[in-house]
Amino acid sequence: MSRIGKNPVPVPEKVTVSLDGLTVKVKGPKGELERTLPEGVSVSVSQDNNTIVVSPTSTKRISRERHGLSRTLVANMIEGVSNGYSKALEIVGVGSRAQVKGKTLVVSAGYSHPVEMEAPEGITFKVENNTRVIVSGIDKELVGNEAAKVRAIRPPEPYKGKGIKYEGERILRKAGKSGKK
């Protein structure tokens, strides 16, 4: 049995959860999320103490694997609609900067042209000091994917550390080639 999966998921007071088979709908102050969980698990809502219990339907390996996954997905949905998620990125390098125009993030990262990224539904971009980009939303998976796309515009290089990196990310630095003496 999954050690993560056997813990019940607490539901805050402002959040409502509805089940339709394996489809879980979570509604909270920040918005609404819906997700269909994989086969092999069953979900039940305990109304008396506001918890959600995820349990495997059989003892097969696939069912046990999906048990912890499903519990974590539901917990992330509840956390997202109550508090939201955000991921910060730093732009390092001379002349590299970012700005927001409407729902579009415009990044000047050393190319001959600025790179534009349109924010998908449920994601917002915020720029501080032209070098710090904050990607925020209620869906943890979508926030992480969009932050990864922003980082992929110009990943940090190991010699000078220039590029776009996650806040707090440590870049493994390499020594440059030593010249002939």
Swiss-Prot record:
GO terms for molecular function: rRNA binding; structural constituent of ribosome. PROSITE patterns: RIBOSOMAL_L6_1 (PS00525). InterPro entries: Ribosomal_uL6-like, Ribosomal_uL6-like_a/b-dom_sf, Ribosomal_uL6_a/b-dom, Ribosomal_uL6_bac-type, Ribosomal_uL6_CS. GO terms for biological process: cytoplasmic translation. It holds the Pfam family Ribosomal_L6. One of its GO terms (cellular component) is cytosolic large ribosomal subunit. Keywords: Ribonucleoprotein, Ribosomal protein, RNA-binding, rRNA-binding. The keyword Ion transport does not apply. Belongs to the universal ribosomal protein uL6 family. This protein binds to the 23S rRNA, and is important in its secondary structure. It is located near the subunit interface in the base of the L7/L12 stalk, and near the tRNA binding site of the peptidyltransferase center. Part of the 50S ribosomal subunit. PANTHER family: 60S/50S RIBOSOMAL PROTEIN L6/L9, LARGE RIBOSOMAL SUBUNIT PROTEIN UL6M. This is Large ribosomal subunit protein uL6.
